[in-house]
Amino acid sequence: MKIWIKAICITSFVIQMSACSSSAQTKNDSRPAQAVQNGIQQHVEGKDIVDIPEAYKRKLKGLETVKGKVLHIKDGDTIDVNVKGQKQTVRLLLLDTPESVSQKIPPQKMGKEASFFLKKQLDGKSVTLVYDQGPKEDKYGRKLAYVFCNGIHINELMAKSGYGIIAYIFKPNTTLLPEMLEAEKEAKEAKAGVWSIKGFVDEKNRHYNRNDAA
């Protein structure tokens, strides 16, 4: 009987020590972590997250920025954002992804994939919108912005991942054009996403061949 009681006590002690060790490890690992996604540094959500990394801050200095929360992903390059209690439709600047919900043409290849990828990055998350030097809206009344979330430039991430191409290039809304073009170049060389479909991207005119439906 004494041996049995002793065994129970030892087991209980081991379990308690394991729980304490696990708790301590969790506490020590609660600092913001960093990871790399498709070559672009991203910051896992945590206390000391910087919305816009220093390298971008220098280039974007003086441009208007606003904070908001993503309400809805409309497609791969358009989102609805709550800004100070008002819903704003935002088009990701310098980016064009294949159509997934257009009423004018059938859904295109990679359109749904682009929307899903963007949703995974932004749905329900806080973002910082950066407006460039030129017009802040397009002809449809959508805001034109660089979108940052947890230290990631989302426009650039979409291009680098092959879910979109660089398009609608109008000065002076071109502050981050070099970074966007470099991201697109890497996706093209890797034959990622839209670049994996032969003849899909019309590079000269910077649009998609619309007859390539999903």
From Swiss-Prot:
InterPro entries according to UniProt: SNase_OB-fold_sf, Staphylococal_nuclease_OB-fold, Thermonucl_AS
Pfam families (alphabetical): SNase
PANTHER family: EBNA2 BINDING PROTEIN P100, SERINE_THREONINE-PROTEIN KINASE 31
Domain TNase-like: 64-197
Signal peptide: 1-24
Full protein name: Uncharacterized protein pXO1-141/BXA0211/GBAA_pXO1_0211
Active site: 91, 99, 142
Keywords, in A-Z order: Endonuclease, Hydrolase, Nuclease, Plasmid, Signal
Molecular function per GO: endonuclease activity; nucleic acid binding
Source organism superkingdom: Bacteria
Organism field: Bacillus anthracis
